[in-house]
A protein has these predicted regions:
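Bacterial N-terminal signal peptides that target proteins for export
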Residues: 1-7
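N-terminal cap/lid segment of alpha/beta-hydrolase-fold proteins
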Residues: 23-89
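Short, surface-exposed "cap/lid" segments of acyl-processing enzymes
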Residues: 87-89, 94-166
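Flexible, surface-exposed loop/gating regions in the mature catalytic domains
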Residues: 172
Length: 174
């Protein structure tokens, strides 16, 4: 058993020695998936009526497009993308649920380009569900103030770092 363990460590050391730099997202090699997909959870339909039709130009010099905001909208749903690894372990999947006004992309990579928690758990055989909460990311936004009653919140680039005390500064977890 000891000899097999040492041989395994030698193989891993060789593989890691040949790996690309740590900032390269492919550093751990390809991830083999059995399945991946997405779905929405919850939500409701809302119908808008009596709103003015607008002509808008989306591309400089382009032809105007007529936008009619009247109709049925799907709102307040959560978007979930799932990944099932080829060689799975664990009886239950792992749900990555962000907070603080962020999105599921929080778990895909780190700010400096390294792999995030999504790949970390996939590489260890866990089925992972990565969510975008209501009114965030790929879950979509509802019109304000017609459907969603409060102003949308937009965060600066530094806001999460300051709020969660990451990096340099007083009270930071450096």
């Amino acid at each position: 058993l000891m000899l097999k363990t040492l041989a395994g460590v030698a193989v891993l050391a060789t593989l890691f020695g040949c790996a690309t730099p740590a900032h390269d997202s492919a550093a751990g090699g390809p991830i083999a998936l059995k399945a991946m997909g997405s779905f929405h959870v919850g939500g409701r339909e809302v119908e808008l009526k009596g709103r003015p039709v607008k002509d808008m130009v989306f591309t400089p010099g382009g032809a105007p497009a007529r936008i009619d905001p009247n109709g049925v909208y799907q709102v307040e749903q959560m978007y979930v993308q799932y990944f099932v690894p080829q060689a799975g372990q664990g009886q239950l999947p792992l749900l990555l649920w962000h907070g603080g006004g962020l999105t599921g992309v929080t778990y895909e990579t780190t700010p400096d380009g390294r792999e995030g928690w999504l790949n970390y758990f996939l590489r260890r055989g866990w089925t992972v569900y990565n969510s975008d909460a209501v009114e965030r990311g790929r879950s979509g936004w509802a019109q304000y103030p017609d459907i969603f009653p409060t102003d949308p919140v937009f965060l600066t680039k530094n806001n999460p770092f300051e709020r969660f005390r990451i990096g340099d500064g007083p009270g930071s977890y450096n």
